[in-house]
């Protein structure tokens, strides 16, 4: 007696083939992702070392220049700063529409919001218009690092996402060569070529009320108050509010 062959329908064979192809593709994708992650980890570590060396050399150079100026009986003048950090210190009471609009353009919608800005003529003109409502100055490396690591949120798909993973930074800014938090810090601190994209990715910082409170919000900093330009002393205020 001849045994009858079981004929597998063509649709089943096609489905089986598709499933095998999908399984192979999935396996290849997982392996590619693992390889990319390993390469990224090496690159991130290398860049972090490079940035650390760069910051240390700049600090060493600054100390040397200050010492040299002192020996010559003069004093060292810092090169013009490129980066500002602005904090809104007053609410909406008695605020005129134009001032309100500028504060919105600066992304300072709430009291104790803080943002980074590039120093240029347009920025300084806007700050003068809203000076009674803000305080600002030149953030140092420690301030930029602590703000981004402690209070940093990014904008990804129109959502506010905590910067808990380098992959979040890479998703948003990888096309600009910014693949980790240390890259982001470096781009902001040095006001790099993709500062605009990096800064727009950062959500405005929500700071806490400063320890010890503020003195006189309506008065200028140089008059013993809090508003306006406090230059390098912004770093002391950032510590109290972070």
Swiss-Prot record:
CDD domains: Ribosomal_L7_archeal_euk. Pfam families: Ribosomal_L30, Ribosomal_L30_N. NCBIfam families: uL30_euk. The gene is RPL7B. The keyword Ribosomal protein applies. Belongs to the universal ribosomal protein uL30 family. SUPFAM superfamilies: Ribosomal protein L30p/L7e (SSF55129). Keywords: Ribonucleoprotein, Ribosomal protein. It comes from Arabidopsis thaliana (Mouse-ear cress). This is Large ribosomal subunit protein uL30y. GO terms for cellular component: chloroplast; cytosolic large ribosomal subunit; cytosolic ribosome; mitochondrion; plant-type cell wall; plant-type vacuole; vacuole. It comes from the Eukaryota. One of its GO terms (molecular function) is structural constituent of ribosome. GO terms for biological process: maturation of LSU-rRNA from tricistronic rRNA transcript (SSU-rRNA, 5.8S rRNA, LSU-rRNA).
